[in-house]
């Protein structure tokens, strides 16, 4: 499935029925991508890529968002020139009940145990 905005640009996303558990777990296994998902879950809103203050290059940031999108964890759509990112919570909950909340809770416990050094702040 692709999303096309007025700009005519489209981004591929897996349909709900094509989201695979191993792809979701792989996407969430990277600390940077997990932090992106934690921030999206905390904000409960769409955020632009530039709102994430990640300590990596733009190309690496793009890679992380692509992995999250292609795994079905996030949906990216263009709104004008901005690429908006939203968590596909409903799709993930439908396919893997409780998985996302369990992972987010475990990540919160780990961040508390390891301190703020384990947290990647988001700008915004």
Predicted feature locations:
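Conserved acidic functional residues
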Residues: 30, 64, 97
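Canonical helix-turn-helix DNA-binding module
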Residues: 50-76
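Generic signature of intrinsically disordered, low-complexity, basic-rich segments
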Residues: 1-3, 23, 58, 67, ...
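N-terminal helix-turn-helix DNA-binding core of bacterial DNA-binding proteins
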Residues: 22-57, 79-91
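A general structural signal for short secondary-structure boundary/capping elements
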Residues: 69-74, 83-86, 102
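N-proximal short alpha-helices
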Residues: 5-10, 25, 34, 38-41, ...
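Low-complexity, charged, repeat-rich alpha-helical/coil interaction segments
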Residues: 16, 34-35, 62, 75, ...
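Amphipathic alpha-helical dimerization/coiled-coil segments
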Residues: 2-20, 38, 42-43, 89-124
């Amino acid at each position: 499935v692709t999303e096309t905005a007025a700009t005519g640009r489209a981004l591929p996303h897996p349909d709900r029925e094509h989201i695979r558990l191993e792809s979701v777990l792989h996407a969430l296994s990277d600390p940077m991508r997990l932090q992106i998902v934690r921030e999206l879950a905390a904000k409960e809103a769409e955020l632009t890529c530039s709102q994430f203050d990640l300590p990596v290059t733009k190309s690496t940031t793009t890679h992380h968002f692509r992995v999250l999108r292609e795994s079905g964890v996030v949906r990216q759509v263009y709104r004008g020139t901005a690429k908006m990112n939203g968590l596909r919570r409903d799709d993930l909950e439908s396919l893997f009940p409780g998985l996302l909340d369990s992972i987010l809770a475990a990540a919160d416990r780990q961040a508390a145990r390891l301190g703020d050094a384990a947290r990647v702040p988001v700008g915004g």
